[in-house]
Amino acid sequence: MHGLLLAAAGLLSLPLHVLAHPQPSTNLAGRGVDLDAYRMADRSSYMSSDDMKLKQPAIASLSGGNYVDTATEVVKRMMPGMTFRMVDDHYVGESGISHVYFRQTMHGMDIDNADFNVNIGKDGKVLSVGHSFYTGPAPDKAPVEKRDFSDPMQAFHGACKALNLSINSDKATIQTMNEHEVMFMGTSGAMSDPQGKLCYMAKEDGTLALTWRVETDMGDNWLLSYVDAKETDKVHNVVDYVSHATYQVYKWPIPDPTEGKREIVENPWNLKTSPFTWISDGKTNYTTTRGNNAIAQANFDGGEDYLNNYRPDSKNLKFEYPYAPNMSPPKSYIDASVTQLFYSANMVHDLYYMLGFTEKAGNFQVNNHGQGGKGNDFVILNAQDGSGTNNANFATPPDGKPGRMRVYIWTKAKPSRGSSFEAGTVIHEYTHGLSNRLCGGPANAGCLNGMESGGMGEGWGDFFATAIRLKPNDNRNSNYVHGEWVNNSPKGNRLYPYSTNLQTNPLVYTSCNKYNEVHAIGTVWCSILYEVLWNLIDKHGKNDGPTPVFENGVPNDGKYLALKLVLDGMAIQPCKPTFVQARDAIIDADMNLTKGSNKCELWKAFAKRGLGVGAKYDPKNRTGSKAVPKECQ
């Protein structure tokens, strides 16, 4: 019998705020089952570095050997007499912190909701720990010795009945995987063969229950049902890997608070591009603005730390917080600000994934689920970042290291405005991550640091932000300004509006000769791409929905086709490209994607702004050209 070992470890007094397990969603796909009734209790504790030094100085000073051995010794000392196994997913993070994970066992079986994680600092010493180990009375004998449990098929039927699952098991058979795990073969109605695992689970009343963990993937719900191993009509707890969440936001493509109202959107993710949803990384489900693609939080002091920064948390996954443009100070609406930033960045992730910015291309995800590339690199999203004002930025390291977006408070209006609420700002910044990862390959993040190539980086950001926010009634005579809301100015923060009218926007390729600043050069590049956009829309029409529709791998409208070609061009062009090379890469992208069916539309767009056939690059004396190939004249 294991007694009150937590007291000896100094952990009983700690607040129980670390989640040990994914949390279930609030409904079961319309089947009338309230999963809140089966929700697992939050029963983990966390000991910070300061707590370790104060309460466990001997353990905090442990070092030497490798980090796995050190972490194992920590668990042995803090949980004497308990049995456990190391989970095979330990790693050293980019910050130098080593993370090692353990699962408590009893009589050779997992206690499925009893975990221990040890964090080792880069100095080799214990940084912090968290755990949800069970410390109550233990059964005297292993259940396999007494055969003190039901047939797994009974547990499977019990789960299906209790949760009203539409699974036909009339012809089901059991396939034994190992001593404690089985698979239910011959069923229909689930996405894959259901599975069963004999395991313990720590109950809320401090006792231990022997259960069959029945796993059923129903598509809209992916369930782990903990069915009592003796009374199979009793389900103790249910975990749903599919999270149902609501966000109160300015829904895409609303660009800023002046052009629409906030609304509540439910489950806005695309499971084809974010298979774990936005609030899970495939291992842990979160109840805050954190997931596989991004982690969003306040960063009032502008520091580098983000994991311990404030972010809204909602156990029922309702990220609905008050906001109005006249609210002040900005901290009063930080929950809404973080939520909006998280929503917009994830929308960008999902769209860019559909357009080709996948794992192998170097996108930003913690878990690449076997699709290539390097993981552990979600985007760190800092709302109301205190390191500056009237700006925003994006840091793009090579694939495998997290990107970082910092959006600031803008003081050009009264009251000040948080740039999380201007979608164009978020899209622009995220697009820096896109272009830097694609140009020159995911491992080379330094290909856009020249004046012209860096200018194109700014131009791509404006272009994607502008194209995404087009309205249903827009046409080639529509003009767009970048940053007008945060700047509190109808002129925004660019030289001219984006327009196909040369009187409204006279910029051409040779305009770059008089500019020596990347945003100005970027405005020229985006002005050229804006012509490309409308030439393709005029030919193929415009899809006003939030995602493209593909036919044989090609977007069937001009807007998303333009985005696709520009994105593909980024990956095709050389490191440190010029306008001329980027132009050629886009034309090559169309040749690859559509066999060149848009060649003339592209050339005419480029030529209109002086980037025609005869255009030549010289950093101080660019040569413009309005010529197009003979077949396009």
Curated annotation (Swiss-Prot):
Cofactor(s) this protein cannot do without: Zn(2+)
Species name: Trichophyton verrucosum (strain HKI 0517)
Keyword Zinc-finger belongs to the record: no
Glycosites: N285, N592, N621
Compartment(s) of residence: Secreted
Free-text function comment from the UniProt entry: Secreted metalloproteinase probably acting as a virulence factor.
GO BP terms: proteolysis
Enzyme Commission identifier(s): 3.4.24.-
Catalytic residue list: E429
GO cellular component, one term: extracellular region
Keywords: Glycoprotein, Hydrolase, Metal-binding, Metalloprotease, Protease, Secreted, Signal, Virulence, Zinc, Zymogen
Signal peptide: 1-20
PANTHER family per the UniProt record, alphabetical: EXTRACELLULAR METALLOPROTEINASE MEP
Pfam families assigned: FTP, Peptidase_M36
Gene: MEP5
Similarity annotation: Belongs to the peptidase M36 family.
Propeptide part(s) removed at maturation, as residue ranges: 21-244
Identification of the protein by name: Probable extracellular metalloproteinase 5
Lineage of source species: Eukaryota, Fungi, Dikarya, Ascomycota, Pezizomycotina
Transmembrane segments: none
